[in-house]
Design a protein with these regions (language model features):
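Conserved catalytic loop of SAM-dependent methyltransferase domains
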Residues: 179-206
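Short aromatic-enriched loop/helix-cap "lid" or pocket-rim segments at secondary-structure transitions
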Residues: 83-86, 142-147, 190-195
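Short alpha-helix
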Residues: 159-175
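Short, glycine-/aromatic-enriched active-site segment of Class I SAM-dependent methyltransferases
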Residues: 134-158
Length: 241
């Protein structure tokens, strides 16, 4: 589906949600970078898709005062050859085998498409100082009750179904240290979450539950999780130098 270019036959797929995802990531990421005085001279977006997150994060780094010299977007789908943006290099490549050491990585809505997520994260982790994840939580009552697993496997190609604990466990098992996590409140308003009449009717209910207990919302309707993690070895080496 991905390597053949079928998934991104429309190269703008999910582009409209990119800004919401970056806002959610930035809320956790930039206070950590500032507090720990972590420079971001290089940044890679793994599984860059339409390139929307890569572009939005480039702008966010700039307005936050980072002078990021090297920015790359990686995807195994051939559509990346059509993506163009000043100061960003888009590559059709598997980052786990071809990527270089980077200060910052983002993986937005990627893990659910991977059959061996621990090995995949570990393959990236040894090249990363900081990794920011945005992870859909599809292991919820809404999916179970409506028997949506089959449909999600077919499109959008979700191969595993995660909840809050299993997502955090995958990241820890990959050898990374979790610095912070929170639910992606910003993406409740994203276009893809407000397309159908049913979604529009459910929106105020979701919003109310999210204010009372985001964990409960994740268990009932599903949600997305933002996780910021670091490679302690690379960060220690950077501080020593």
């Amino acid at each position: 589906m991905y390597k053949e270019g079928v998934y991104f036959s429309d190269i703008t797929r999910h582009h409209e949600d990119s800004g919401y995802k970056v806002k959610a990531i930035s809320r956790l990421l930039f206070p950590i970078l500032s507090l720990q005085k972590i420079p971001v001279d290089s940044y890679a977006d793994v599984g860059c898709g339409s390139g929307g997150v890569t572009k939005a994060m480039k702008e966010q780094l700039k307005v936050s005062g980072f002078r990021t010299k090297k920015i790359e977007g990686f995807d195994i789908s051939p559509h990346v050859a059509q993506l163009k943006e000043e100061a960003i290099v888009f590559k059709m490549a598997d980052f786990t085998t071809e990527g270089e050491l980077m200060d910052l990585f983002t993986l937005t809505n990627v893990l659910e498409h991977i059959t061996e997520p621990v090995n995949f994260i570990a393959g990236i982790a040894h090249k990363a100082k900081i990794i920011a994840f945005h992870i859909p939580l599809d292991d919820c009552l809404n999916v179970h009750f409506r028997n949506l697993q089959r449909a999600k496997i077919k499109d959008p190609g979700h191969l595993i179904f995660l909840n809050t604990n299993s997502a955090l466990n995958l990241i820890t098992q990959s050898g990374l240290k979790i610095l912070d996590y929170d639910y992606s409140f910003e993406t409740l308003s994203a276009p893809s979450n407000n397309e159908t009449n049913l979604q529009k009717i459910a929106f105020p209910v979701k919003l109310l539950i999210s204010k009372i207990s985001p964990c409960l919302l994740a268990k009932i309707f599903g949600f997305s999780l933002v996780v910021i993690a670091k490679n302690e070895i690379l960060n220690d080496l950077g501080q020593a130098s």
